[in-house]
Amino acid sequence: MGPYLSQPKTEKSTVTGQNQVFQYAATHMQGWRNTMEDAHISDMNIEPDVHLFAVFDGHGGSEVAIFAERHFREELMKNKNYQQKNYEKALTETFFKIDKMLQEPSGQDELNKIRGVNDETSLAGCTANVALIVGKTLYVANAGDSRSFLNRDGKPFDMSKDHKPDDDQEKKRIERAGGFVSDGRANGNLSLSRALGDLEYKKDSRFKPEEQIISALPDVKVTQLTASDKFLLMGCDGVFETWDHQQILNFVNQELKSSQNLQKATEKLLDQLLAKDTSLGTGCDNMTCILVLFK
């Protein structure tokens, strides 16, 4: 059996919310894939004026993405740097904490329960694109190839960059750790170079966690939100295969002008991005999109 269904699953699950500062919609759709491996967080007011959104795109299974969805908020809020308002450092440390939890027996037990198996080591992983809004400051921590961008004065302002094995910096780390890059893939397998999980690439005790073949180290980008920022859009890589950021921005703008309904906007966007068939391979992935509209 190949990776695709004979017909796409186009049913969508959407959650919405709003407060005095923004409203949001988070939508996911399985699409052509045999399984749904995405997970996400949409959590307003984890504290007064602090909000958390995240996209986790799983590979090799859904269990690591689901684990991150379950635990990221709690681990972030327990972090001492978070409590001291050192948010950049707190986000980075939480990525590594989740990765460490995955390696512990209790973490493996939970992964096995998610998968419905016993006594196996999970080889799955996931991207993590995490947005923390604190007042008027936006922090985005990213590991992998899920993305976030702002609509800033009608133009996309990227809040993350993809981590790919053939990028010079990534390739050097992979090779220093004893790995190799072939056909744009780490060890000829993974098409991204940073992720949560993927524990088989993180076993060498000679190297720090950030030095392993696959690293959980996120890039963290920070910006101050102003009146020129209309919305934040986050998504797994399946959202960005068909259209570029400007095309997505224009489509969302047009939908919001006509309906002011975020759920309609995100659901129609995924319909537009879904491939008609699987012949080209693009537009065939699971899709998760979070739209945060600032008031």
UniProtKB/Swiss-Prot annotation:
Question: What cofactor does this chain's UniProt record say it requires?
Answer: Mg(2+); Mn(2+)
Q: Where does Mn(2+) 1 bind?
A: D57, G58
Q: Top-level EC class, please?
A: hydrolase
| Family under the similarity heading | Belongs to the PP2C family.
Gene Ontology BP terms = signal transduction
Q: Where in the cell is it found?
A: Membrane
Gene3D superfamilies, per this entry?
Answer: PPM-type phosphatase domain (3.60.40.10)
Q: What cellular-component terms does GO give this entry?
A: membrane
* Location, primary (coarse class): membrane
User: Which residues are noted in the entry as Mn(2+) 2-binding?
Assistant: D57, D237, D285
**Organism in which the protein naturally occurs:** Paramecium tetraurelia
Q: Which GO terms describe its molecular function?
A: metal ion binding; protein serine/threonine phosphatase activity
- What lineage is this protein's organism placed in? Eukaryota, Sar, Alveolata, Ciliophora, Intramacronucleata
Q: Which domain of life is it from?
A: Eukaryota
Instruction: State what protein this is by name.
Output: Probable protein phosphatase 2C 5
Record's InterPro entries?
PP2C (IPR015655), PP2C_BS (IPR000222), PPM-type-like_dom_sf (IPR036457), PPM-type_phosphatase-like_dom (IPR001932)
Q: Which UniProt keywords apply?
A: Hydrolase, Magnesium, Manganese, Membrane, Metal-binding, Protein phosphatase
From the UniProt record, list the reaction(s) this protein catalyses. Answer: O-phospho-L-seryl-[protein] + H2O = L-seryl-[protein] + phosphate; O-phospho-L-threonyl-[protein] + H2O = L-threonyl-[protein] + phosphate
According to its UniProt entry, the function of this protein is described as: Enzyme with a broad specificity.
